[in-house]
């Protein structure tokens, strides 16, 4: 009986290790293509919101380019494609896809797997969010921001908007459907994302190919 109990405990431990290892999976992204694309003025002309998505996934090179456009590093000193107040770099970009939730790590140009669960439907209150290839979830780190309210809310809102507009312009250049959203059950989503108390969801943005 004791041997059986020990075997059960060992099996439970191994399963925990396996699940933990799966959650810590890292996806290395291809180097972003930082030249070419649609001219800026044309991308501004084409920029729009769309809410009808096909189920087609984004290829890794396109995903890499999207994330770099939104919040990639574009200078040797570690600065980003979008500004941030006091250079706090306080916004994290999470990517919710059918194969799990990932954290974009711009310095390493990689995705850190947070969960294997498909939480796309929980990233907003609109039905279409579950159909988009991915949903970007912008999360502010209040500890990094190091500001008191209401200044913190103002600046993290502005910082998030810069990232979202970068993503909009990339999607216009690439012919992707995109819409930024504020209608989110933030407490429920934060729990699914395993966020820390000092992390605050600001906006989400659905991205994918247009429905044909």
Regions found by a protein language model. Give the residues of each.
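Small-aliphatic-rich amphipathic alpha-helix that forms the alpha element of a beta-alpha
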Residues: 47, 66, 93, 134-189
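Short secondary-structure transition/capping segments
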Residues: 190-194
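Generic beta-structure capping elements
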Residues: 32, 139-141, 208-210
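A glycine-rich helix N-cap at a beta->alpha junction
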Residues: 195-212
